[in-house]
């Protein structure tokens, strides 16, 4: 048996009487910004696209023009990308798909690629795929959905993805990526101390006590520590200001919300079904989210600091999106 710390049977260190907890880093849950501009191209920003990395599985959210270049610049691996989520069928959110799919074909990809979108994307994209990619090395599978209500559209062992009905000039939705609760963490030193057999570990992780060969009951609380709280990431772009989203966004760890305009341009925001920075911040404040990331900036602003100042005056834990930015979901943004 391997060596372990000098603990008594209550899990305390005999030397200094301090409780010992097995150290376990939180699983990876990070957001990469590939683009944060809006419809009009600029030299400062790429169109909207993001990648969420959950335990080294990559989920792309929107795919504007040039997304595959930014994907490489962010040092992400194409082989780990199997799912793409499209919010709506405006070009600045999906024009990058054809190029990305073609590149994956040139690379000899064999794994299926799943694309989730409002109804209509397959009808638009499939003819171009048929024309430009006669010999596809892999399958592209479309999963289309209606945007009027909240739907569970994806689930695996780690996360669920639920739609957020938004209001734009065409059918549009956001997404909530939610971690599933994880079993308790094993305190390895206590497992060694009581010489717990390996076959008992799954039961213990799921809440069972351990009974020693002598009949002593070792409480689960001595053998485990609680797992980290599940984290949630919410993506809202493009949409006008929707105060009723507070209930669905309540307490999320990170909210990305479009902030195309400042409050002074609110009439233009209303006309184009977009949101101001102040409105995005008000939604974040009312929903009591941990942190707010704003993006989808209008090309009219050469300096987005005006958007940041406006948002922070309402919700201080706000940050501007920026190409190649990587954010840990669960961290709190503080003003510099």
Name each model-derived stretch.
Residues 5-7, 21:
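Short hydrophobic targeting helices and cationic amphipathic motifs
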């Amino acid at each position: 048996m391997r060596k372990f710390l000098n603990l008594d049977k209550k899990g305390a260190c005999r030397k200094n009487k301090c409780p010992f907890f097995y150290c376990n880093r939180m699983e990876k849950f990070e957001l990469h910004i590939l683009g944060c501009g809006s419809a009009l191209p600029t030299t400062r920003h790429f169109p909207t696209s993001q990648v969420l990395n959950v335990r080294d599985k990559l989920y792309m959210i929107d795919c504007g023009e040039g997304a595959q270049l930014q994907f490489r610049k962010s040092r992400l691996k194409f082989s780990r990308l199997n799912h793409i989520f499209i919010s709506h069928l405006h070009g600045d959110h999906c024009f990058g798909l054809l190029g990305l799919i073609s590149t994956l074909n040139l690379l000899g990809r064999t794994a299926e690629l799943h694309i989730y979108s409002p109804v209509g994307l397959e009808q638009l994209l499939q003819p171009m795929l048929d024309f430009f990619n006669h010999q596809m090395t892999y399958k592209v599978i479309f999963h289309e959905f209606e945007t009027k209500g909240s739907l569970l559209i994806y689930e695996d062992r780690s996360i669920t993805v639920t739609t957020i009905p938004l209001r734009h000039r065409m059918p549009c939705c956001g997404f909530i990526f939610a971690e599933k609760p994880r079993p308790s963490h094993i305190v390895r030193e206590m497992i060694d101390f009581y010489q717990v057999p390996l076959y008992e570990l799954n039961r213990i992780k799921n809440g069972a006590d351990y009974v020693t060969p002598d009949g002593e009951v070792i409480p689960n609380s001595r053998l485990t520590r609680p797992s980290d709280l599940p984290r949630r990431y919410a993506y809202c772009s493009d949409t006008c200001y929707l105060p009723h989203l507070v209930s669905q966004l309540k307490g999320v760890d990170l909210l990305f919300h479009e902030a195309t305009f400042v409050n002074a341009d609110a009439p233009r925001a209303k006309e184009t079904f977009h949101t101001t920075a102040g409105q995005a911040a008000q939604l974040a404040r009312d929903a009591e989210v941990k942190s707010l990331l704003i993006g989808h900036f209008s090309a009219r602003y050469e300096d987005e600091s005006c958007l940041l100042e406006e948002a922070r005056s309402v919700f201080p834990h706000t940050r501007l999106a920026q190409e190649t930015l990587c954010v840990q979901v669960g961290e709190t943004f503080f003003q510099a």
